[in-house]
């Protein structure tokens, strides 16, 4: 039996400019030998649980750690931070290698923006100048706060705006 539930939504303009809130959730991204987190064809129960945990915490999305305690992804999107002009994202070992994620990494490299796929901690995240999410639906969505802590100015930062503009130019081609 195959069940497909389609949903059509529009981005909330307020969230696209003002940013969203994240809460670190206890649900982690799974190990590849139990449910490969890089594939979009398995049950998404862990992401659904993370979404419910974020909602219970009063956040828009749940920030998920990998099995080793490093920041990884959210329940629905890939996660990036900006520190001192450099863009950081997870190694990709425990998240979907999303098309928008890959395009943002490629855009950074093509435009001389330092970008790192690395392990990083919640402390690194709390001290970030900016944070944003990538996804097909929201492109580059700014993160205003994580666990009640304001990130940067609490609004879309200059790097997120630059990457959003570069991405829009790319998809126009």
Tell what function each PLM region has:
Residues 1-173:
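Helix-start/capping segments and mature chain N-termini
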């Amino acid at each position: 039996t195959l069940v497909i539930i389609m949903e059509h939504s529009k981005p909330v303009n307020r969230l696209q400019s003002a940013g969203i809130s994240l809460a670190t959730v206890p649900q982690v991204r799974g190990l590849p030998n139990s449910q490969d987190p890089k594939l979009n064809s398995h049950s998404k129960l862990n992401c659904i649980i993370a979404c419910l945990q974020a909602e219970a915490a009063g956040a828009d999305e749940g920030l998920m750690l990998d099995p080793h305690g490093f920041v990884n992804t959210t329940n629905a999107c890939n996660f990036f931070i900006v520190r001192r002009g450099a863009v950081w994202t997870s190694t990709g070992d425990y998240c979907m290698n999303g098309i928008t994620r890959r395009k943002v990494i490629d855009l950074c490299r093509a435009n001389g923006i330092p970008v790192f796929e690395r392990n990083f901690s919640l402390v690194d995240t709390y001290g970030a100048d900016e944070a944003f999410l990538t996804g097909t639906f929201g492109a580059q969505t700014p993160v205003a706060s994580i666990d009640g802590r304001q990130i940067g100015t609490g609004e879309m930062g200059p790097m997120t705006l630059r990457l959003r503009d570069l991405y829009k130019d790319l998809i126009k081609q």
